Amino acid sequence: MSGDVAAENSIHIQNGGSCEVVQSNGVTTNGHGHHHHHHSSSSSSSKHKSSSKDKHRDREREHKSSNSSSSSKEHKSSSRDKDRHKSSSSSSKHRDKDKERDGSSNSHRSGSSSSHKDKDGSSSSKHKSSSGHHKRSSKDKERRDKDKDRGSSSSSRHKSSSSSRDKERSSSSHKSSSSSSSSKSKHSSSRHSSSSSSKDHPSYDGVFVKPEPVSQQLMHSGSVDAFQMQQLGSYEAAAAGTNFNGNGNVAGANYKNGYEESIVDIKKEEESFNNLSQASSCDYSMSQFRADEPPFVVKHEQSYAEEDSTMNYNDHDDDADEMNDDEEDVPLAMRKRKQEATDRPDGGMDNDDDDDIPLLARKKVKKEKIKKESKEKSKKRVKEEPSDDYGNVKPKKKKMKKEPEPAVSPGKRQKAKAKVEEEEVWRWWEEEKRADGVKWSTLEHKGPVFAPRYERVPRNVRFYYDGKPLELSEETEEAATFYAKMLNHDYCTKEVFNNNFFKDFRKSMTPREREIIKDFRKCNFQEMFNYFQAESEKRKAASKEEKLIKKNENEALMKEFGFCMIDGHKEKIGNFRLEPPGLFRGRGEHPKMGMIKRRIQASDVSINCGKDSKVPSPPPGSRWKEVRHDNTVTWLASWIENVQGQVKYIMLNPSSKLKGEKDHIKYETARRLDKVIDKIRATYRDEWKSKEMRVRQRAVALYFIDKLALRAGNEKDEDQADTVGCCSLRVEHVQLHKELNGKENVVVFDFPGKDSIRYYNEVEVEKRVFKNLELFMEHKKEGDDLFDRLNTQVLNEHLKELMEGLTAKVFRTYNASKTLQSQLDLLTDPSATVPEKLLAYNRANRAVAILCNHQRSVPKSHEKSMENLKEKIKAKREAIEKCESEYHSRDEKKGKQLERLRDQLKKLELQETDRDENKTIALGTSKLNYLDPRISVAWCKKHDVPIEKIFNKTQRTKFLWAVHMADENYRF
């Protein structure tokens, strides 16, 4: 490495103490301009950085003055570790390069436009001697350091006279914090930049020099050569007449606002790009560079950490005072980072390693980090007390990698906040249960949200009767739109639906309209249908901004009306919106389908809230039907709907305490049944032989409820759908076969179950049950009840005698959960993959769904989704074949790829099997209503299956109590 310096600068001292540094590249720096900028916004972070670097460079500059050799290259750097262990002559050579780099650094600090204006006026002093140049550049550097150590927010930081700044200083005045000492301080140690490790402080003539927390590599404290170099540097500094400002800091160091953003531009510094070692031993502050020059930024910025050392130094009393002032300038965030930087395994990167790092790799510092540190500079600085145990041991400094703090976007903050709110769960299951029937002590809510008023369709959207447009009244038009919106639905093809609608449609008409509109077949709703279809498409094609506005409106409504306060806890409401007017559909083949559901008014609604709570306000100009304070019920509002005359409720969300408690009690009751089920089964078997027909019918019905998980079945009125349960079975629903398909005593059930879903099952029963059924069906014709001496009320009273809280639904819940538990034990292979375990779980779930007759029609999208899945499987198989053909000539990497492809194919094939098996089975119904969720939670925990694979978000929220309660050893 050459120690020559080619850059020649001249310094013009102004009367006010300002100076201009003119370099060969023509860039001029005005000291006062930068000084003022630093005064307004500099941070302790940049102060510390610049000071430590200046001291490192100026330590070597003293040898530059004694050696006449100079180089023509800027930004040269040498290995500092090599400097520390070489002879003093060779180390001075390397120091010369650091000095040269420092001179170049000064030139780069000139980023203001005024520096370019003074370019021509100062170019005449370019060709001075090399030693003179370094002397003056050091003088300029001292001024900047002096300015730096004055406070960033107080004007008193600049009250040193210009004469003290203009004093002649030697180029060796700046020592590194690890090697500098003055004639008065013989062994001043290098103080750590972190407040926790500040034990020995360098002092010059009794004055403390502030270091900075940057990744400068320090001299090994145990090295004798390094110590000799320190003392030699101290004596040379004293001989050169080194001066320091009154604040105890090297004068000079003009910086801009902390770390300024600089755009990396490699082409503008080709010399630095060619010499990768230039940035290795010198970490520049971002403010040292012009905005148009590429900064030398180390990839992993580092800070010091305290370590043991074997070299002892003596402290001066004034060091402790300077430490106190110094810590005041350190931002709290910076001190925190210093304290945390303790665990880097490699102990920092030495200079040789630094030299090996490509320049591009060292320039990857995020702009976000720079901006963040700039913001920290504007914060109020917190004074930190100095450590009382300042020892006389110089700690060895270890570089630590500083992880950049990730910038959090507003969206992520909102998600994080929402996550925190979700984690703040009301653990009601850990509270003591109340046995007095009281559901809550305090309840407050805002009431329901009413459906919006009807907005008439545009005048060009018309209703046609008998081919002619007909203008309708507002009420009649609204009724017509109800039907128009469903025009493409299957309901509109049903005669019952159309007849019921037209009957109510005529009720909404004016007398004149009623005279004209008499035949439903002449009504034409097509134009209205087209309008609503176009509106639907328009909503789907809305811009992101429009959708966001709508979303925000819904969220605001949810925030206001979607929550209530119950016993001091915020709970979500399930259906806070009242049902809008429309056409009644009903479940299954309901006889009232198509009837018009009228608009609900405030006068129809009863409110339930706490006595001491604020009663919800009704819409202006109206009043509630009733305000109640009943804490034995869980509903918040109720009304009677006009179609069936049933009471409708606004209830809490399934994830609420009241709903969760109800579920918990249901499953605990089913678990209690497990303890007495054998006794109950023995009882109804004995009753098959009873002399009373009533007892026999009850015993056979209970057998079917237990074995087939049938619903009890209530009697239906004529205006209700004809669905059948166990007690309401009729003769036509049951067929008896002495032998069928190789089975004996077979009973064939075929009847419409809940939601008019067909229940068909061929069951082999015990011989005594078969004979009893033959007895029950004697002398009965089609339409007669099979169990003519039994109803649900009688059955439930008997069940309560067998066990407290026992109902037909408890039997259904018990058998469903018991089936799931046994099927999981049977089908789950602990060594299987997660997809295979999921297939086993779905098969167990499907067994329950079949038991409970949870069927569904094949989804319309099933065929298309299966085709897509088969295409994926085909493509995956082709990829495997191609990979196998290349495998023999490939390395191990190809083998891993082949294994991965096979796993993916297996996963797709399992998915295809699972989807096809479940096309007519509704797994969700049993999962939500009949299966103890703790069984699934325990299975997931035991077999390392993510709970998200079993329960979706809604189900996880509903069963949060189960997730917290159950461990892997839970058994139903």
Curated annotation (Swiss-Prot):
Isomerase among keywords: yes
Region forming the signal peptide: none
GO molecular function, one term: DNA topoisomerase activity
Enzyme class: isomerase
Disulfide bonds: none
Biased composition (Basic and acidic residues): 51-65, 72-86, 93-103, 139-151
Site (Interaction with DNA) location in chain: 539, 587, 635, 666, 723, 754, 796, 854, 872
Top-level taxon of origin: Eukaryota
PTM annotation (Phosphoserine): residues: 303
Residue ranges, compositional bias (Polar residues): 11-31
Assembly mode: Interacts with Topors.
This protein's name: DNA topoisomerase 1
Species for this entry: Drosophila melanogaster (Fruit fly)
Gene: Top1
